[in-house]
């Protein structure tokens, strides 16, 4: 039996509120396990990653521009997503993700097939589609009266719901 052991854990959730509860439960489990084993423990907390704040108006704007750019196999936004570093950004400013496929349907995102597909012309084209969608959405936000305000209002409402 080693005199010392070390573990690293990443705890994620689809919402910041749920994440806080899961973290509390995890700490209780560590405390209980240390009592049962008669050992001490030390916890060093790292960076917390939060869920994304949805802004459907912004997502719709990006999707429409991605379609105009000719992006293939656009997927609708996910209803729930895990925590991510981009979620932390989206707690400060409105953001959105568009998902343009460059891998065959059903390919696991954590696989060698996905990595290999990322080196293809289709993947490089997706960068262009994304850039065109962002440029078009930016132009719409600048040129359409009140559109930026709508995005900001939806962001503020959804941020309140997610805290």
List each language-model region with its residue ranges.
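Metal-dependent amide/peptide-bond hydrolase catalytic core
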Residues: 1-163
């Amino acid at each position: 039996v080693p005199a010392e052991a070390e573990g690293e854990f990443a705890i994620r959730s689809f919402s910041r509120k749920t994440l806080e509860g899961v973290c509390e439960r995890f700490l209780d489990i560590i405390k209980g396990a240390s009592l049962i084993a008669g050992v001490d423990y030390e916890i060093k907390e790292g960076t917390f990653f939060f869920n994304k704040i949805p802004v459907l108006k912004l997502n719709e704007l990006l999707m429409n521009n991605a379609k105009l750019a000719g992006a293939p196999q656009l997927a609708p936004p996910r209803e729930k997503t895990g925590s991510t570093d981009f979620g932390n950004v989206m707690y400060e400013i409105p953001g959105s993700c568009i998902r343009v496929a460059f891998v065959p349907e059903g390919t696991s995102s954590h696989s060698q097939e996905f990595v290999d597909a990322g080196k293809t012309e289709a993947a490089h084209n997706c960068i262009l589609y994304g850039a065109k969608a962002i440029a078009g959405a930016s132009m719409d936000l600048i040129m359409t009266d009140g559109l930026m305000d709508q995005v900001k209002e939806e962001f503020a409402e959804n941020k309140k719901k997610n805290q």
